[in-house]
Amino acid sequence: MSKPGAELEEVFSSVQGEGMLIGLRQVFIRFRGCNLTCDYCDTPAGTPAEPCRIEQTPGRRDFVPADNPVSLDRVAALVEGWQRGWPGVHDSISITGGEPLLRHDILMQWLPVLREHLPVYLETNGVMHAALGLVINHVDIIGMDIKIPSTSGCTDLWDDHRQFLEIANTRRAFIKIVVGEETEDWEITRASEIIAGVNRDIPLILQPVTRAGDTLGIKPVKALELQELACRYLAEVRIIPQTHRFMGQL
């Protein structure tokens, strides 16, 4: 039986610009659609009628359009070809979005196949804990967001994040919080308490929000103060901006 196709935004090769895998080359598979509307989101909201962009040569931006839904066979063949033609270049496959867990039904069938070629790295907003539980056995590493109200505009997600983290903790995982000048101490305290309540050794990354013109929306001293606050609860807290934006990468 053939695997179901997926509504994708793009498939391409680039360096990871955020989180614990920063600087490593990945195959990015960007799923379309999200369950949240964050104020700082930089991902285009495509519609099902629009084609997916698929890069032909890794990192060269020679995109061609592909009708949605895109088949697993096409994506798997692309990854296999890149692995054969550029051995050792890619560290892993980034399953990103949008929010890929919206299509957990597709992920349950796609991930075992993709994982035959490279480890699977799931980038997620950290809310859909039930969906994570369904695919967790096919994931190697999880980059999870905690959405704080001051920068994301999202509220009342704390319990969802806690439940999500309890499942994510069964894999290698780290957490990212986008912070800005408007971020309040209580937000970092509450997030840090949630993380420490599950596992204080899970790394936390404070990511300065990127504003228009690729400028950072937080003063250095403010970022340091938030880091100092989180370090009261957690063993590893880093400040890392979106480096791919500085390099002109996707």
UniProtKB/Swiss-Prot annotation:
Family of the protein in this entry: Belongs to the radical SAM superfamily. 7-carboxy-7-deazaguanine synthase family.
Domain Radical SAM core per the UniProt entry, residue ranges: 21-250
GO molecular function: 4 iron, 4 sulfur cluster binding; carbon-nitrogen lyase activity; magnesium ion binding; S-adenosyl-L-methionine binding
Top enzyme class: lyase
Known role: Catalyzes the complex heterocyclic radical-mediated conversion of 6-carboxy-5,6,7,8-tetrahydropterin (CPH4) to 7-carboxy-7-deazaguanine (CDG), a step common to the biosynthetic pathways of all 7-deazapurine-containing compounds.
Protein name per the record: 7-carboxy-7-deazaguanine synthase
Enzyme nomenclature, EC number: 4.3.99.3
InterPro entries: 7-CO-7-deazaguanine_synth-like, Aldolase_TIM, rSAM
Keyword S-adenosyl-L-methionine applies: yes
CDD domains: Radical_SAM
One GO-annotated biological process of the protein: queuosine biosynthetic process
Protein's gene: queE
Organism whose genome encodes this protein: Geobacter sulfurreducens (strain ATCC 51573 / DSM 12127 / PCA)
Functional pathway: Purine metabolism; 7-cyano-7-deazaguanine biosynthesis
Keywords from the UniProt entry: 4Fe-4S, Iron, Iron-sulfur, Lyase, Magnesium, Metal-binding, Queuosine biosynthesis, S-adenosyl-L-methionine
Obligatory cofactor(s): [4Fe-4S] cluster; S-adenosyl-L-methionine; Mg(2+)
SUPFAM superfamilies: Radical SAM enzymes
Protein residues bound to substrate: V15, Q16, G17, R30, T96
Chain positions recorded as Mg(2+) binding sites: T43
Subunit structure and binding partners: Homodimer.
